Amino acid sequence: EMKRVEPSFGVSDFLQGARGAYEMIVMGYERCDLAEIQPFLADDVYESFVDGVAAREDQGLTIEANFIGVREMELNDAKMDETTKEAELTIRFVGELTSEVRNREGEIVEGSSTEIKRQKDTWVFARVMGSDDPNWLLVSTDG
């Protein structure tokens, strides 16, 4: 259906872009650098990220994280609204990263810079097919 509305659409190209977006968005959130990732987030997702970052800052927590890579990635669902032409693709990611949380005193309170943790996320990306804007927005995150 999506290809009918937008013949140039390809799932493998989308997945390649989604993989890059996943790393950029996860690391933007971990590093509290939301300005860089805001253009890729739906407003409500952005607001929830802002709240999460603010909560960390209120507690005096800082995170030092390194992205190792995407271990698994699966297209779980794809649907398109015939009327609005808005497509939604649901992707399940398994990412690996190291993450160290420190308190105001600089003590590690969670994680480790050497221990690789697996993070599972199910994200929904949306876009109006056939529109001039090629970017997909992250409209839902569900660990």
Name each region found by the language model.
Residues E1-E74:
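Core segments of small alpha/beta cavity-forming domains
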Residues G10, S48, E57, N76-T83, ...:
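Residues in flexible loops and secondary-structure boundaries
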Residues G10-S12, L61, K85, E107-S112:
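Short secondary-structure boundary micro-motifs
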Residues L61-N103:
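Surface-exposed, charged secondary-structure patches
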Residues E88-G143:
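Compact beta-sheet-dominated globular domain cores
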